[in-house]
Structures are given as structure tokens and as C-alpha cells.
Curated annotation (Swiss-Prot):
<comment type="similarity">
    <text>Belongs to the universal ribosomal protein uL16 family.</text>
</comment>
<dbReference type="GO" id="GO:0019843">
    <property type="term" value="F:rRNA binding"/>
</dbReference>
<keyword id="KW-0689">Ribosomal protein</keyword>
<comment type="subunit">
    <text>Part of the 50S ribosomal subunit.</text>
</comment>
<dbReference type="InterPro" id="IPR016180">
    <property type="entry name" value="Ribosomal_uL16_dom"/>
</dbReference>
<dbReference type="InterPro" id="IPR047873">
    <property type="entry name" value="Ribosomal_uL16"/>
</dbReference>
<dbReference type="GO" id="GO:0000049">
    <property type="term" value="F:tRNA binding"/>
</dbReference>
<keyword id="KW-0687">Ribonucleoprotein</keyword>
<dbReference type="GO" id="GO:0003735">
    <property type="term" value="F:structural constituent of ribosome"/>
</dbReference>
<dbReference type="InterPro" id="IPR020798">
    <property type="entry name" value="Ribosomal_uL16_CS"/>
</dbReference>
<protein>
    <recommendedName>
        <fullName>Large ribosomal subunit protein uL16</fullName>
    </recommendedName>
</protein>
<dbReference type="GO" id="GO:0006412">
    <property type="term" value="P:translation"/>
</dbReference>
<dbReference type="Pfam" id="PF00252">
    <property type="entry name" value="Ribosomal_L16"/>
</dbReference>
<comment type="function">
    <text>Binds 23S rRNA and is also seen to make contacts with the A and possibly P site tRNAs.</text>
</comment>
<dbReference type="InterPro" id="IPR036920">
    <property type="entry name" value="Ribosomal_uL16_sf"/>
</dbReference>
<keyword id="KW-0820">tRNA-binding</keyword>
<dbReference type="GO" id="GO:0022625">
    <property type="term" value="C:cytosolic large ribosomal subunit"/>
</dbReference>
Length: 144
């Protein structure tokens, strides 16, 4: 499971997700990827499930990059606990995802195989996604 080794603050506020992704919104490493079209929290377990789904499908064919990291702690209080007595303990970690964020990148396989692998991975994720290729970003006006 992905989680930070050390954090500055053990517990953080929930916050809100506004706007589109301004960073991590283009393909940096691979030829294919999946890009979020809605916002949401993706847990470390969901990232791992998607990674396994992709790797099982492509076998030893290509290279996979995970472009998101769960760095936000989510706290929960135990069941049937009265209100008050402080914030709950950290239960799991999430990555905050905004529309436009590239979640996974893949190279070393053909487009048809990459499309199916990303489709399988997208079923494991709580956000809507779309399949993107390097060609899509070159048509839009280049990369950084």
C-alpha cells in the first residue's frame, strides 16, 4: 500500500476540490494513459487494485507509471462513539484528483492492448476517466 514515510502534520482537514488539474495533466513518460474527467479521492487500495489489473492484462509486455500518490490522511472515529473527544485516528490515505489529472501511463504495448488494460483499471477507480495517447496532447499544442 502506498503511503508517505513521514508527514509534517498527522491529520489534515478534508478540504474541497475546485477547478481543474494544473499539474500532472499531460503524458510525461508513456505513450498511453488514463486521465480523470471528474474529481474525487482515490485511496491507496484502489490505486493498487488498478495497478494489479493493468499488470495482469499486459503481463510482462510494457512499462507502467503511477502518476498519483496518496498523501492525504483520512481519519475515522470508531463505530458507536459519542461525538467529541477529538479527531479520529488515521484510517487510510487518499490522493486528491481533479479533472485533467493523468493517473496512469503505459508504454511498450500496442494501442489496442493499452486501451483494454486502462479500461480494466478504470473499473477499479471511483472517478470517471478517459483514455489518452501522446498524439492527443501533440494535437492540443505541445507538451512542456
Amino acid at each position: 500500500m502506498l503511503m508517505p514515510k513521514r508527514v509534517k502534520h498527522r491529520k489534515v482537514q478534508r478540504g474541497r476540490m475546485k477547478g481543474k488539474a494544473t499539474r500532472g495533466n499531460f503524458l510525461a513518460y508513456g505513450d498511453f494513459g488514463i486521465q480523470a474527467t471528474t474529481c474525487g479521492w482515490i485511496t491507496s487500495n484502489q490505486i493498487e487494485a488498478a495497478r494489479i489489473a493493468i499488470n495482469r492484462y499486459i503481463r510482462r509486455g510494457g512499462k507502467l507509471w503511477i502518476k498519483i500518490f496518496p498523501d492525504k490522511p483520512v481519519t475515522e472515529k470508531p463505530a458507536e462513539t459519542r461525538m467529541g473527544s477529538g479527531k479520529g485516528s488515521v484510517e487510510y490515505w487518499v490522493a486528491v484528483v481533479k479533472p485533467g489529472r493523468v493517473l496512469f501511463e503505459l508504454s511498450g504495448v500496442d494501442e489496442e492492448k493499452a486501451r483494454e488494460a486502462m479500461r480494466l483499471a478504470s473499473h477499479k477507480l471511483p472517478v470517471k476517466t478517459k483514455f489518452v495517447t501522446r498524439r492527443d496532447f501533440e494535437e492540443m499544442g505541445g507538451e512542456e
